[in-house]
Regions:
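A composition-driven surface/loop motif
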Residues: 1-176
Length: 176
């Protein structure tokens, strides 16, 4: 069922759209005509493709309270996993009371493949996009991926009211 939310205070709003026939969710800034209420969302091939080159991807295995990384572009500090470079990342496993944070300055797309992920957090959103040009998350076929947060998480800098939060273009695709 498609849904959207839009602010009436400005012409630039945040919209989330779900297309059940292709399992695509896109969150992006769009322009609306408040008089007409029209919303325009454009998806490109990068937003809808679920394929990736596994040999070029960094692997992140969540291990309850930390993570093991094979590849580059990732830092791990306890239960906080931070993606720091554009590229492709395959994530699997369970992270208890931690978060996956995307903090990439500059150009390029961050492609994240969720391959059986379960992340919980009592202190912050378990999936945060702080900075990136674009993030595309693919839900691997046949997997269950879960992000669970506390009722409302607050850090020194941010107040998160959702399990998944983004300050950049964020697209979900796939059938997992």
């Amino acid at each position: 069922m498609p849904w959207d939310s839009a602010s009436t205070d400005t012409q630039t709003t945040t919209v989330a759209t779900t297309q059940t026939n292709s399992s695509v969710v896109n969150t992006s800034s769009v322009t609306t005509d408040e008089t007409e209420g029209d919303i325009s969302i454009e998806l490109d091939e990068e937003d809808t493709t679920t394929s990736y080159n596994e040999s070029e991807a960094s692997k992140i295995e969540l291990t309850q309270t930390s993570a093991t990384v094979t590849g580059s572009g990732v830092t791990v500090d306890g239960s906080k996993v931070t993606i720091t470079s554009a590229g492709t990342y395959v994530i699997s496993g369970t992270l208890t009371d931690g978060c996956i944070d995307v903090n990439v300055s500059g150009k390029g797309t961050v492609r994240i493949i969720l391959n059986g992920v379960n992340v919980t957090s009592s202190t912050t959103a378990p999936f945060i996009v702080e900075d990136a040009k674009k993030v595309v998350v693919t839900l691997a076929d046949g997997t269950t991926n879960t992000f669970t947060d506390s009722t409302r998480a607050t850090t020194d800098d941010e107040d998160y009211s959702a399990a998944i939060t983004s300050k950049a273009d964020l697209t979900f695709n796939g059938n997992g």
